[in-house]
């Protein structure tokens, strides 16, 4: 560094040095390019004053030092090369014609901060001796463009000789050599200048190679490539959505399904003949098919639409929907309805498990699945489970297993272990009995839902999935409709000689029927009788005379038409083998109590219909006429409400019980004069006899031709005492919530 220790005025000119000395000086000046410079030696570069540059006594060495931005006579270490900066004068707007186009990296320079001066220092690139001659030609070609009138010379060659361009000595430019480390790494605009001409051909060559590769592929490889491209597109869309702000906002719940679409889940559109998926399925006559197979539910977007509607609902409306769902589940009228609701809920949960969807803990299905196993057991407990499961009169091991699957695990001591919890955690496919397997599915799904909802309330910022809680793989082995198939299949395949067991199965599978003899009230009736009265009943004018007869006295006496039609018959479509036998006994033994209490009856004004033996063997046509169990007639004058009722003849010690008639009304049962006085063994139903008016004309009812055949009758022996739960220790089987399970 002895050259830098010399005084500036004592330094010889570059032209007086030999070529070897000049190379040695340049090598010493740029030997510190790769060494870090201490911060205290780094100083801001400032343009030199014109007086210093235009001084007559300044040598060529001084001019070279001024062009690199030396502001003082003291030595400072060499600064590594930096990328050039381009900025215009802050005060004056220069003419664009006076500024050259972007130059190659080897000849980059920047405009200064004030006065339009050019900073020609270490802002360029070094190591010009390694540059090729092509860059020199570019520099020479671009040197003819005027830069700034303040400069008159530039050192463009290795000898340091000044070059004049176009006869104007004021337009000079200095070439700053580039360093090997920074060669080619310039401003982005320079990259366009270097590679702009080769970008097009390279892209065309790449497309040509891709085209050749595609031509060489067969059909299978093309399909695999297509699937791979689709997968990459979905991944890129998800990453782009997460970074661009189209993903769910911070206020959206963690279980939001905005990122899940039918295309991303590979779901096919649901068939057009299905009922439109809605979050409020309250229409009684749905337009469309509601029976869906396993594949239609699991591999279409039908359930996805229903789940998205739950997410779009506001919180108050969603809570109302949960209440509606709870009452619909807990008020299921019969076994068929409850099994359909259970399989609907389990299929909905299976859909989330299969496609890996985050679960909404406030979903109406998750709110109601906790009590379904207890409801199902209550329905099954009305059957003769000892005969169905154990083929005996009392309870056996299979009945006890079914009860343990439903009951709540007990709180045992520390040294005792309740095996109920272990039984409920067994995989459902390990049970051989169909009812056990069906109950195990319901129990497993219930435990998974309760565990997930408990975890979601504790950890609010993390989405929850069913596979995290499905410990016995019940959701993996479940198929849509499996619970209904197992239970109904077991009931249909059961064969025994017990008539009561058959009757219980028949009643369990039949639609709901209304059975009530009378509706008492105290001072005022708060009962909503519109639930029992039919919408298409007789008018008030047809029953005006019957209302007037009841107003005449305190006691209600049957009319002549009612007394004349005391012989009751069961509808042939619902008559069973033991109903025929009871019917024959009822005709031979009429009730003496009713025969003594009833007044003498007139012959029937209308001939009764008789059914042939072939009609008795017709199939049963199920009818749910629970909304037409009472026929209401109002007197125009006194507004007297009259209900045509039927009193069932009791058999000691059973009380009076009401049975449903053929049209839904409850008719008064009195003995017919054509029979004896012995009581019937089984109460039978009586066809509707129209009430006779004052003129003696019979009123016609419009519902007689519209009502379908009735369901099977209920025998007298099956009263409320006999139909009571047969389970031992049934008082201990109280309904509980699965939220208390451990």
Swiss-Prot record:
Pfam families: Herpes_UL69
Compartment(s): Virion tegument; Virion; Host nucleus; Host cytoplasm
Comp. bias intervals (Basic and acidic residues): 1-11, 153-171, 578-587
Keywords (A to Z) from UniProt: G1/S host cell cycle checkpoint dysregulation by virus, Host cytoplasm, Host nucleus, Host-virus interaction, Metal-binding, Modulation of host cell cycle by virus, Phosphoprotein, Transcription, Transcription regulation, Virion, Virion tegument, Zinc, Zinc-finger
Superkingdom in the source lineage: Viruses
Statement: the UniProt record of this protein carries the keyword Ligase: no
Compositional bias annotation for Basic residues: 72-85
Subunit structure, as described in the record: Self-associates and forms high-molecular-mass complexes. Interacts with host DDX39A and DDX39B; these interactions are required for UL69 function in mRNA export. Interacts with host SUPT6H, EIF4A1 and PABPC1.
Stated role: Immediate early (EI) protein that plays many roles during productive infection including regulation of host cell cycle progression, regulation of viral gene expression or nuclear export of intronless viral RNAs. Acts as a transcriptional transactivator via interaction with the cellular transcription elongation factor SUPT6H and as a nuclear RNA export factor via interaction with UAP56, a component of the cellular mRNA export machinery.
Protein name: mRNA export factor ICP27 homolog
Annotated organism of origin: Human cytomegalovirus (strain Merlin) (HHV-5)
